[in-house]
Every structure is written in structure tokens, then in C-alpha cells.
Design a protein with these regions (language model features):
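Short beta-strand/turn micro-motifs composed of small residues
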Residues: 97-98, 121-125
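Generic alpha-helical secondary structure signal
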Residues: 105-106, 165
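Short, conserved loop/helix-junction motifs that constitute active-site signature segments
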Residues: 88, 109-116
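Positively charged, amphipathic N-terminal segments that serve as targeting/anchoring signals
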Residues: 2-98, 103-104, 129, 134-139
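Beta-sheet entry/capping signal
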Residues: 93, 118-119
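Short, Lys/Arg-enriched charge-dense amphipathic segments
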Residues: 36-39, 119, 146-148
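Short, low-complexity, polar/charged sequence segments that are solvent-exposed and flexible
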Residues: 113-117, 138-141
Length: 177
């Protein structure tokens, strides 16, 4: 969700098919480990049973489930996926993950080892052993999970939790400060 919000705020076109959807953490890491395979060799298929369970469209790329929570139909989700897939620049990737939805320390370690120069994982606490980890104090939903970073911190400031991260520097300098 954050990718769409940040892209919208910075007036950037959605150049990733992963905008407005989510993956389970272990499946997201598997997706990233074989990104070209999942993006360019797999056909997005509907998972009708999981869609019924979730109440929104769920797709499948081989062994990866893709949760399209902001779409009304699988057809609409697949159309947007394929449209944005054509815009992917494999030489200009920014990878973002959030410690939630069952994310484990093992998942964080696996994410940290991924061979991407421009990556960040927002975490519920400090993890000094992981270079890609970034903790926003107060953003914890509980001890093992980060709340929705698109939520406003309070009704007075107009600041969202994601505003505590310097997105412009991350996108321009391509590294964590």
C-alpha cells in the first residue's frame, strides 16, 4: 500500500505491478529471489477459493499468492498487473517490505540477504544486525508487527507514519541513511 501512496505523493507513475496489493512475507521473499521468473515467465491465475476466503481477488503466480485487496475483480487486478508489468525497469528497482502479516526474524534475515541495492524493511523494533531494517518509533502495532504506515499518527499533525522516513533521499541516494 505504501508504494502507491508514496508514488502518488511524489507524482510518480505506478511502474510496478505490486502497487495496491500484498504478499505474505515468506512468499514475497521467494518472489524477490526469482523475480524475473515470477514476473516474466508466470501467468497470473485466479485463486477462486482463497478469493472467497479473503473477500477480494487473490491471484497466483506458480507457488506465490498475490492479494489484490484494492480491486473489485480478478480481471481488473490482472489487467492492472499486466499494464504495470510492462513498465518495470529491472535496472531501477526499489524494494520495500514491512514486518507484518506473520513476518518472522528469519524472513527479515532472508530479506536482508537479497541481492538488491535499494531495499528497506520497516520493523517493529531495532534490528542492528540487518542493514536493510528501519524502525520508526511509535509505528509498532505490537511487539512483532508494524501498523499500517499509511495511517495518520494523530488527528492534529497531518503526518502519517510513513512520513517519518526520508523517501526522497532513499529514492535519490538509493540507500538508507
Amino acid at each position: 500500500m505504501w508504494g502507491g501512496v508514496v508514488s502518488h505523493e511524489l507524482e510518480l507513475r505506478f511502474n510496478s505491478p505490486t502497487v495496491n496489493l500484498w504478499f505474505k512475507p515468506d512468499e514475497f521473499i521467494r518472489f524477490l529471489k526469482r523475480l524475473k521468473y515470477y514476473l516474466f515467465e508466470c501467468e497470473m491465475q485466479s485463486d477462486a477459493n482463497r478469493s472467497l476466503e479473503c473477500g477480494y481477488p487473490v491471484g497466483r503466480l506458480d507457488d506465490i499468492h498475490v492479494y489484490f485487496m484494492h480491486y473489485d475483480s480478478f480481471e481488473q487486478a490482472k489487467r492492472k498487473w499486466n499494464e504495470r508489468l510492462q513498465r518495470v525497469n529491472m535496472d531501477n528497482l526499489y524494494i520495500v517490505m514491512v514486518e507484518r502479516d506473520g513476518c518472522t526474524e528469519k524472513d527479515l534475515a532472508a530479506f536482508d540477504k537479497l541481492d538488491y541495492k535499494h531495499k528497506v524493511v520497516f520493523t517493529a523494533k531495532e534490528y542492528p544486525q540487518f542493514h536493510s531494517a528501519y524502525h520508526i518509533p511509535g509505528s509498532e502495532e505490537d511487539t512483532d508487527s508494524v501498523k499500517d504506515l499509511c495511517l495518520y499518527q494523530n488527528k492534529f499533525t497531518g503526518k502519517r507514519w510513513l512520513d517519518e522516513f526520508d523517501w526522497v533521499s532513499f529514492l535519490n541516494e538509493r540507500s538508507l541513511s
